[in-house]
UniProtKB/Swiss-Prot annotation:
Keywords: Disulfide bond, Knottin, Plant defense. Belongs to the cyclotide family. Bracelet subfamily. It comes from Viola arvensis. Probably participates in a plant defense mechanism. Has strong cytotoxic activity against human lymphoma U-937 GTB and human myeloma RPMI-8226/s cell lines. There is a cross-link at G1-N30 (Cyclopeptide (Gly-Asn)). The presence of a 'disulfide through disulfide knot' structurally defines this protein as a knottin. This is a cyclic peptide. GO terms for biological process: defense response. Disulfide bonds join C4-C20, C8-C22, C13-C27. InterPro entries: Cyclotide, Cyclotide_bracelet_CS, Cyclotide_sf. This is Vitri peptide A. The lineage of its organism: Eukaryota, Viridiplantae, Streptophyta, Embryophyta, Tracheophyta. PROSITE patterns: CYCLOTIDE, CYCLOTIDE_BRACELET. The keyword Disulfide bond applies.
Length: 30
């Protein structure tokens, strides 16, 4: 539930490397 400061509209979350995932076009962590 914490925004990772990255969007995932066009590309996947690069921040997935630290546990972020795409939700509603924005990368979140927990």
């Amino acid at each position: 539930g914490i925004p990772c400061g990255e969007s995932c509209v066009w590309i996947p979350c690069i921040t997935s490397a630290i546990g972020c995932s795409c939700k509603s076009k924005v990368c979140y962590r927990n």
